[in-house]
Every structure is written in C-alpha cells, then in structure tokens.
From Swiss-Prot:
Keywords: ATP synthesis, Cell inner membrane, Cell membrane, CF(0), Hydrogen ion transport, Ion transport, Membrane, Transmembrane, Transmembrane helix, Transport. SUPFAM superfamilies: F1F0 ATP synthase subunit A (SSF81336). Its main location: membrane. It comes from Acidovorax ebreus (strain TPSY). This is ATP synthase subunit a. PROSITE patterns: ATPASE_A.
C-alpha cells in the first residue's frame, strides 16, 4: 500500500509521461498490432478543429476591410499558395496540392501546439475521468514517431501517384532504372546500371521519407522532454526550498521555453509543409 502511494522519482515521472494509451501492451519495438489511441484521438480531434476554423474563416469572409482573423487566414493562404506556385508548376496539380499543403500546415501546427499545455493537465484530467491514477495519456501526436512517419509515408504515396499520373507508368518505370547514372547501349552494362539506379532510387525514397518524419518527431519529442524537466524543477522547488525563489525560477523558465517553443512548433509545421511541396514538385519533374 505504502509502495503504491509514494511520490514518483524523476525517472519514473518521465517514463510514465512517455507512455501511450494503447489498445494492447507493446511487446516489441516494432509491433504493428499496437495502436496509440491517444495519438489517433488527439490528431483526429485537432484535424476536425482545423477544418472547422478554416471553414469558419471562409464562411465569415467579407469583401470589405477584413478583421484580424480574416486577415491572418488570408496571409496564411497567400503564403501557402505562393510556395505551391514556386514548387508545383502544373496548374492542374496545384488545385489539389495547394489546399493539401495548407491542411498539412494547420494540422501539424495544432498538433505541435498541444505541447504548450501544462504537462500534467490533460493526463491528470484523464486519470480522474477513468479513476486510474496510473492511466497513460500523451497529448502531442507529433511527438509520436508512428504519427510523423505515417504523415511522411502518405506524402511518399502521393509522390508515387503524381509520378505515375504525370509521366505514365512506363515513363516512371524507365526513370527508376535510368536515373541518376543513365544507361548503356551494352545490354550487360545496361542491366548493371539499371539495378544500381533502382537501388539508388529506393534508398532515396526511403531516406527522404524517414528523414521527413524523423525531423518533426525529434524536435517535438525533445521539446516535450524539456517541458517535463521544467515541471520536475517545479516539483523539486515545492519539496526542497522554502520561499519563492525556485518556484519563480520554474515559472520563468517555463515561460521562456514556451515562448521559444512557439517559434519551434510554427517552424516545424512550415518545414514539413515545404518538404511536402518540394517532394511533390520533384515527382512532376523528369530526371
């Protein structure tokens, strides 16, 4: 009884906050039967919220002097549209890709922004709702590698779709075995070059997809850990120091990191969106 009631150590606190609410207990590093229910639920809710905000902006838009909300949305839409035009030169493709890029930016920004909530706020509320003081809940979907790799894999699939749509199946297949080293009139050399080119293409696709997802995950995971350490500093202040010096330091450190983190979450959403546009633009180009 006493063992269950003791306050968690710093390592126990961090480990607990890094555990997901899952459908079944994970038994290995790679287990496709495991679903991180918290990441799925939060990402879906934020996706619906993002769509509602953009719908509301379109619904309330006026032709007169725009309000602050409309002006901010118009600036965002114009920024994304300019980036889409710079990377996607096919006007027909842009009709789908530009709104997709806007959706990606807004969705990832909202998921990243969950990191600004107090570390224990939603987990404690969830524990109270379930009646389980040890219930797990992580609320930053982009700090979950399965989420970010899922997003980057979706971009990879779109790259395949547009490569086939623009170049045709034959044209894309020819590109896979002739780029980047070309081919040869000699059948033996042509076969060797074809195998090498295909391997290089596979490596390139895998590397781009993994780095695309890992970049977002790494930044958000690190940010989440920093917030946990700041929260632990507040706990240490309450237990070890009389007065208000360390608690004030805890508040100041948390505020400074939160302000800096606003830049990080925005920048990471922008980078993911830009790489999406760049990769889809490359799918339109002949190599």
């Amino acid at each position: 009884m006493a063992a269950d009631a003791h306050a968690p150590t710093a390592s126990e606190y961090i480990v607990h906050h890094l555990q997901h609410l899952q459908n079944i207990k994970q038994k290995s590093i790679i287990d496709f039967s495991v679903v991180n229910l918290d990441s799925v639920a939060v990402s879906v809710i934020l996706g619906v919220l993002g769509l509602f905000v953009m719908w509301l902006a379109a619904r309330t838009a006026t032709s007169g002097v725009p309000g602050r909300f409309q002006a901010a949305v118009e600036m965002l839409v114009e920024m994304v549209d300019n980036q889409a035009k710079a990377n996607i030169h096919n006007a027909q493709s842009r009709k789908f890709i530009a709104p997709l890029a806007l959706t990606v930016f807004v969705w990832i920004f909202l998921m990243n922004a969950m990191d600004l909530l107090p570390v224990d706020l939603l987990p404690v509320l969830w524990q109270g709702a379930t009646g389980d003081s040890h219930a797990y809940l992580r609320v930053v979907p982009t700090a979950d590698l399965s989420t970010t790799l899922g997003l980057s894999s979706a971009v990879l699939i779109l790259c395949f779709v547009y490569s086939i749509k623009i170049k045709g199946m034959g044209g894309w297949a020819h590109e896979l075995v002739t780029a980047p080293f070309g081919t040869s009139k000699n059948p033996v050399f042509a076969l060797i070059l074809g195998v090498v080119n295909l391997l290089m293409q596979i490596i390139e696709y895998v590397a781009k997809t993994v780095s695309h997802g890992m970049r977002l995950f790494g930044n958000m995971y690190a940010g989440e850990l920093v917030f946990m350490l700041i929260a632990l500093m507040g706990g240490a202040a309450a237990m070890s120091l009389s007065g208000v010096l360390l608690p004030v330091g805890h508040i100041i450190a948390g505020s400074i990191w939160a302000i800096f983190h606003i830049l990080i979450i925005t920048l990471q959403a922008f980078i993911f969106m830009m790489l999406t546009l760049i990769y889809l633009g490359q799918a339109h180009e002949a190599h």
